[in-house]
Amino acid sequence: TGKKVPTCHRSSFDSVLEDSDFEQACENADGIARKVYREEAKEIEEIRKGIIEVSGKEQPYDIFICYKETDENGDRTIDSVIAQDVYDALTAKGYRVFFSRITLEDKLGREYEPYIFAALNSAKIMLAFGTDFEYFNAVWVKNEWSRYLKLMASDKSKHLIPCYKDIDAYDMPKEFAKLQAQDMGKVGAIQDLL
């Protein structure tokens, strides 16, 4: 049809229609551009409302596990394997854990954002796994942990624990500099997280 269909990978409780940057863009645009901006913003708003509706039906999570699932060859990463071991240990203890490999398994063919949005907003702890600086900064991984850091700024009950292995703690993203990290290469690391 040639029609643009917006997708959202970073939802918010706030409407784009009420965003000061959007309002400024409309103010500075000519009449035609302003009309296009408003029409597209209305479409985005409908998508956002749908995401909020779906996410509102989700049960809250205790913990969100953030990691890179596959490498550049499409093979499973060691991050994913370590994260699954931690997931198994946490769920065995009765925690409700968001782990995309399992949590999103039955959501094939649907947008993942409503479920990620719900989990990020409800989880009190995020465990961000990385065995490589590039994995911590992979697009989807950084999308999740950066959103969580923003939530932490306004909710002091939330905590992010970077979990690293085979890299120097100083090679983690600079945003993690003031966070207590867990070296997953040391004996008993999983038990320490529990």
State the predicted function of each range.
Residues 78-79, 113, 141-144, 175-179:
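Short, glycine/charged-enriched secondary-structure capping and boundary segments
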Residues 10-14, 176-184:
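Active-site regions of enzymes building and remodeling cell-envelope glycoconjugates
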Residues 1, 141-165:
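Membrane-associated lipid acylation/remodeling enzymes share a hydrophobic transmembrane-juxtamembrane segment
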Residues 134-136:
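Short glycine-rich, flexible loops that bind phosphorylated cofactors or substrates
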Residues 131-132, 168:
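Flexible loop residues that form catalytic
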Residues 2-7, 162, 167-179:
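Glycine-rich, charge-decorated loop segments at or immediately adjacent to ligand/cofactor-binding or catalytic sites
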